[in-house]
């Protein structure tokens, strides 16, 4: 208020002086117009900045705030997934020792229909079909869709979100992980083929798995929900090819193909990265998953 009064008095004094000097009146009006214009634009830019900040806060407040569970750090036994051969015959990879670092947290639940819709509504994620209500897991997403969602969530939260590596998913799954290795000692390839056929038939018994609301398939010993339920979950692990030594104890990975990624669930499946429904095609290796979804891990930065 005092500032406005002082400015008014100043302008009145200036105007009185200008009346006595008409030749300077035009210069005064030009200067006054410039000052008013500058103040107007300053006000407009300040208002725009406030609106931008409010919009960012709104997006962050409506973004997913997932419950998290810490993946136990430490050393554990892990069997790599891929196409491996010994003496040119298909075989399973041996167990390897892997280490999980500290500070990695995984979503307690898969990304839901509501969570994914927030990204779509923000104009960042691809529109995909959804089944059921907001508290159902989002399905019908490709690996590429999941990566875009992780990038969006990282951007709006300022945190690092990504798909889990397969060994991280296995560690988090605990007793819910299904090791689909074919334990057979015979060197006859037909024996392995028959064993794989029986395993596939057992995995395909019954109808399509039922989609349930979040938590509908229960929790594992770590408190993580819906692992190995109806939804197969994308990992960032690429398709691997390799050979085993004659004794079968050492694995040499010869190549990786990252146009195909590993999905984990009731069994392992390698799926082409742009596929959203593997039931109609696109499963590169293994039985096709019933539904494709995902959950993310958050990497802490110390």
PLM regions: where:
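Disulfide-stabilized, aromatic/cysteine-rich ligand-recognition loop
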Residues: 2-51, 55, 219-220, 254-302
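A short glycine-rich, aromatic-capped structural motif
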Residues: 62-127, 137-144, 229
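Functional-site microenvironments in short loops/helix caps that host divalent-cation chemistry
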Residues: 132, 143-278
């Amino acid at each position: 208020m005092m500032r406005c009064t002082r400015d008014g008095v100043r302008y009145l004094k200036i105007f009185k002086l200008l009346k006595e000097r008409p030749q300077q009146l035009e210069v005064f009006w030009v200067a006054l117009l410039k000052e008013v214009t500058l103040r107007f634009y300053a006000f407009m830019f300040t208002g725009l900045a406030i609106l931008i900040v409010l919009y960012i806060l709104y997006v962050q407040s409506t973004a997913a705030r997932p419950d998290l569970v810490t993946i136990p750090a430490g050393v554990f036994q892990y069997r790599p997934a891929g196409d491996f051969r010994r003496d040119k015959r298909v075989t399973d990879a041996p167990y390897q020792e892997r280490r999980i670092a500290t500070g990695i947290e995984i979503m307690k639940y898969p990304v839901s229909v509501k969570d994914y819709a927030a990204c779509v509504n923000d104009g960042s994620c691809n529109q995909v079909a959804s089944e059921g209500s907001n508290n159902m897991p989002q399905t019908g997403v490709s690996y590429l869709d999941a990566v875009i969602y992780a990038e969006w969530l990282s951007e709006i939260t300022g945190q690092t979100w990504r798909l889990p590596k397969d060994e991280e998913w296995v560690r988090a799954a605990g007793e819910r992980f299904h090791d689909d290795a074919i334990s057979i000692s015979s060197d006859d390839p037909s024996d392995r083929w028959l064993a794989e056929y029986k395993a596939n038939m057992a995995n395909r018994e019954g109808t399509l798995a039922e989609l349930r609301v979040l938590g509908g398939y229960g929790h594992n010993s770590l408190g993580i929900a819906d692992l190995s339920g109806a939804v197969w979950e994308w990992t960032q692990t690429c398709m691997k090819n390799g050979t085993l030594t004659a004794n079968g104890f050492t694995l040499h990975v010869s190549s990786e193909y990252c146009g195909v990624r590993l999905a984990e669930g009731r069994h392992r499946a390698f799926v082409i990265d742009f596929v959203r429904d593997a039931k109609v095609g696109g499963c590169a290796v293994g039985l096709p998953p019933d539904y494709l979804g995902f959950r993310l891990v958050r990497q802490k930065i110390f």
